Amino acid sequence: MTNTRKTHPLIKIINHSFIDLPAPSNISAWWNFGSLLGLCLIIQILTGLFLAMHYTSDTMTAFSSVTHICRDVNYGWLIRYMHANGASMFFICLFLHVGRGMYYGSYTYFETWNIGVILLFAVMATAFMGYVLPWGQMSFWGATVITNLLSAIPYIGTTLVEWIWGGFSVDXATLTRFFAFHFILPFIIVALVMVHLLFLHETGSNNPSGLISDSDKIPFHPYYTIKDILGVLLLVLTLMALVLFSPDLLGDPDNYTPANPLSTPPHIKPEWYFLFAYAILRSIPNKLGGVLALVFSILILMLFPLLHLSKQRSMMFRPLSQCVFWILVADLFTLTWIGGQPVEHPFIIIGQLASILYFAIILLILPTVSMIENKLLKW
């Protein structure tokens, strides 16, 4: 009799995705982040669901409902801080996952890659709207500043902003719709993740060498299930250490002050995971130019398959490209730092130079270096 695992219409899909899936024998720990992102998504949906049971999306009661969750709900403080810091862990895993794809040339699976970029946009939108919900000072002013950027769109800008706000300023209508979108988007993300995996399993995983590994595959279970468990343990350990020892480490103290439209905080800045994009936005003195640079800073990822001029897929055997890649990583750290600084003399020029370098590396330097390496192969 054939195993139910292999014949049952529903179970066999799970079997082909997570159990009998042929996987390359040499994928490193950098391939753990896919499963860790899945875990982060599950944690966020579950903690978010329990928070939604106690949260009220009204300007008068939103801030106090979050306080109520932390003080009066059983383990409410734990659920709230797991959700807030879970978002940070989510983005750490996301950035490492995307960085892995860039380094090892995984973007040559362009359907998988492009859906991944759409997923990145969806997660960023979800995180932004979630940050508005506690209705603290930074929530309110962050929402005001970021939604206001849409007014830079010619002709329809102002109308569009007022349509999104549901009035002439960020108010109760904005908060209610942000809560609705923040609730629905993770489920859309789950659907996109399934499509992401569907396309990935059409081709199979890439591996560090970038070479075809069809001749040397091993079953996903038990080899990579046990390997993923190590990643899960490290992720949960890090998350719980953050939640239990310094839950407000990555937050902004201004968000413990209820939203007040009459008083602007001295420095409006987003959560740490948006700072690099915020720095690029601020580095351009023109409003529309800044908005375009902001959008293009993420959208540029979609160009990676087109900009790949090397004869080799992975950077494993390309020392010059490796060097440029790590300069790009350093540049992103610099942008993140600048995004959190006030708009003053040394920071403005550093931000502008770092922004130029970011686009130059991706659009010019990496493709040029790839071509040089192709020439060196002939020597």
From Swiss-Prot:
What's in the GO CC field?
A: mitochondrial inner membrane; respiratory chain complex III
Cite a single GO BP annotation.
Answer: mitochondrial electron transport, ubiquinol to cytochrome c
Instruction: Kindly indicate whether the keyword ATP-binding belongs to this entry.
Output: no
**Where does the chain bind heme b b566?**
H97, H196
Q: Which residues bind a ubiquinone?
A: H201
- Please tell me what else the database record remarks about this protein: Heme 1 (or BL or b562) is low-potential and absorbs at about 562 nm, and heme 2 (or BH or b566) is high-potential and absorbs at about 566 nm.
- Name of the molecule in the record: Cytochrome b
